Amino acid sequence: MDMKKLLAVSLTIMILGTLGGCGKQDTQEPPKVKIDYGNSELYTQEDMDAAIQVIEAEVATWEGCELHSLAYGGDAACSDENIEWLNGLEMKEQTEPFTQYILFSSSFHSPVEQRDAWDADTEYEGLQWWLGRSDGGAWELVTCGYG
């Protein structure tokens, strides 16, 4: 093969290799969150999924944290005692008392570098999420933490 042909073939391979990466989008999907819906006579899976979306949106604001699992806390969490307690918490956005509550516990991993209140590169388990709504309305995050 003469030098011109070798150069032309090499150049063509180089150009095609460079163009091959153009237009590619990041196809890596976010990690799947393991969901345990448990058994409920109060809430449908659709009700729970709506609450889960609120939780996932909140965790998405926690830079570097990765949500691993959520587990429904059971129908007993929607007790009159808990409704009274949670309605007693001051929420700026709350315009009327909540009539329903739902509880989830979660596991998540903190960022590799220490940020906010979380220890660096640590798996946290059992963080509770309390959400409330009025008469089947939209779920609102009332509080989260360890209880």
Predicted regions and their residues:
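Sec-dependent N-terminal signal peptides of Gram-positive bacterial secreted proteins and lipoproteins
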Residues: D2-Q25
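A generic structural micro-environment signature
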Residues: L7-V9, G73, G137
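Exposed boundary/loop context
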Residues: S10-M14, D119, W130
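Flexible low-complexity loop/turn motifs enriched in small/helix-breaking residues
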Residues: G20-R115, A120-E123
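Short beta-strand edge/turn micro-motifs at domain boundaries
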Residues: E125-G147
